[in-house]
């Protein structure tokens, strides 16, 4: 069977950017920027994106394009005879499932909050009332199961329709809508009373805040955010490399995707900080920002129901674009392994992922166990820890070593594939850094993540 191909370069860029763009761009990056000294943090973040994320992204794409296989079989085609690199293909495949075991639920939260906002559920509520809405959702599994099932069924239906007719066409609509809604929200924020103060806090370098947070924490924070924002290490980018032509270089395409991901992260702060300063709300991050702080702000804002609806459809699309990309990876791996049709594999995985997502849902109520406290307190936190702190950094390290080591695919093969086509080219002078220094940095990120979780 001839391998499917993406119809257009735009489709490839938007799908790959959609995979990279996720909820972390919104609920983590702006908060870390504010705490990390504003523009100084952004500068560090951009430096680390170029140093860390960009090279590894070119490697995932290059392996995918050279192999023309899904992550689970790509190593087998490219690795030296008798080597064991292909074991990571299975680990990456499992990592995709583990990510979806909680990401489908969180995407469902976004859809639920879009529905609540559109129907006026938050109108007239004080801060305690808004908090109660969030707690009610967490303690009523039926609500979360319903929205999680909606996410999985719709996502798998789209993927089952084929690469071009399903994933590519729908992702173009989702991503363009996401970017347009973002810009509308940012423009609205610029006209709020506290916009100037909020933007100053967000973007102007502030040495005192760097000293307060600690220069070491700011540097490691920027490094971690730059590394994890691109969803590298589980083959989510590799799969789309396998669908594209040889017309463009992988570095040039990766730069475009990184720019889109960074644009979304920075504009998220342009939306959030003017609002928090206008209404005198403390800066927060994570679920507290999205599901408690911002609904309170929209309650106080003129036309808040409208702007809140825009915001949660933006968040839903940001999360759903990642879901679609990972679903495609899972289905492609399943097709390669079983030789079954796309529709058969999609139906099987739709049922499987719904079942695998249930522990996350029940982890806030009947399956809330004390032993989960070191990970954050819930099954979602445990699953997130395994993906973010174990599978992603170690997976990125494997792709990196596979491309630079003579015991793997090797530097020459990587450079030849990466530099095919028009666009920016990787240079041979980068070899020392990519071979000897970058692996140490990635290993540091892995070790620091474990230390920060359990020993700090």
Regions found by a protein language model. Name each.
Residues 1-27, 56-61, 65-78, 82-87, ...:
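Membrane-interface "cap" regions at the ends of multi-pass membrane proteins
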Residues 2-6, 168, 172-320, 324, ...:
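Membrane-embedded translocation segments of transport machinery
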Residues 3-4, 32-36, 66-91, 104-164, ...:
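Inter-helical loop and helix-membrane interface segments of multi-pass membrane transporters/permeases
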Residues 5, 11-13, 19, 141, ...:
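Loop-to-transmembrane helix boundary motifs in multi-pass membrane proteins
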Residues 5-16, 41-44, 83-97, 145-151, ...:
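Select transmembrane alpha-helical segments in multipass membrane proteins
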Residues 11-48, 235-241, 251-255, 259-260:
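Transmembrane helix-boundary motif of multi-pass solute transporters/channels
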Residues 32-36, 84-100, 135-137, 150-174, ...:
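Membrane-water interface regions at transmembrane-helix termini and the short interhelical loops
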Residues 372-401, 423-456:
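A generic transmembrane alpha-helix motif of multi-pass inner-membrane proteins
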């Amino acid at each position: 069977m001839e391998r499917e191909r993406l119809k257009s370069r735009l489709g490839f860029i938007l799908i790959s950017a959609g995979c990279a763009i996720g909820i972390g761009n919104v609920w983590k990056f702006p908060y870390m920027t504010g705490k990390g000294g504003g523009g100084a943090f952004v500068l560090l973040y951009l430096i680390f994106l170029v140093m860390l994320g960009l090279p590894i992204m070119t490697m995932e794409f290059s392996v995918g394009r050279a192999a023309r296989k899904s992550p689970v079989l790509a190593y087998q085609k490219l690795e030296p005879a008798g080597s064991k690199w292909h074991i990571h293909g299975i680990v990456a495949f499992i990592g995709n499932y583990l990510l979806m075991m909680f990401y489908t639920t969180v995407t469902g939260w976004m859809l639920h909050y879009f529905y609540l906002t559109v129907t006026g559920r938050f109108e007239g509520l004080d801060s305690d009332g808004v908090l109660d809405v969030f707690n009610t959702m967490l303690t009523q599994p039926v609500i979360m199961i319903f929205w999680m099932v909606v996410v999985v069924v719709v996502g798998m239906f789209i993927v089952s329709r084929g690469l071009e007719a399903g994933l590519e066409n729908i992702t173009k609509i989702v991503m363009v809508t996401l970017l347009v809604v973002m810009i509308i929200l940012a423009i609205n924020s610029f006209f709020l009373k506290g916009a100037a103060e909020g933007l100053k806090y967000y973007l102007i370098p502030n040495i005192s805040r760097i000293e307060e947070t600690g220069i070491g924490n700011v540097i490691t924070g920027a490094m971690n955010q730059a590394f994890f924002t691109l969803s590298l290490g589980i083959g989510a980018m590799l799969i789309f490399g396998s669908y594209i032509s040889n017309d463009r270089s992988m570095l040039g395409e990766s730069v475009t995707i990184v720019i889109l991901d960074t644009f979304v992260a920075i504009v998220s702060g342009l939306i959030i900080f003017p609002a928090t300063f206008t209404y005198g709300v403390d800066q927060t991050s994570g679920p507290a920002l999205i599901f408690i702080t911002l609904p309170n702000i929209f309650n106080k804002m003129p036309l808040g129901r409208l702007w809140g609806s825009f915001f949660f459809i933006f968040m839903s699309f940001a999360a759903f674009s990642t879901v679609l990309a990972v679903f495609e990876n899972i289905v492609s791996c399943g097709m390669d392994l079983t030789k079954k049709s796309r529709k058969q594999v999609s139906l099987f995985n739709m049922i499987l992922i719904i079942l695998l997502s249930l522990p996350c849902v029940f982890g806030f109520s009947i399956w809330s166990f004390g032993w989960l406290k070191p990970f954050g307190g819930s099954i979602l936190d445990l699953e997130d820890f395994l993906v973010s702190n174990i599978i992603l950094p170690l997976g990125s390290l494997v792709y990196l070593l596979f491309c630079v080591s003579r015991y793997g695919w090797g530097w020459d093969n990587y450079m030849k594939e990466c530099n095919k086509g028009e666009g920016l080219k990787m240079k041979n002078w980068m070899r020392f850094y990519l071979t000897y220094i970058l692996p140490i940095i990635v290993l540091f990120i892995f070790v620091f993540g474990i230390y920060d979780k359990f020993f700090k």
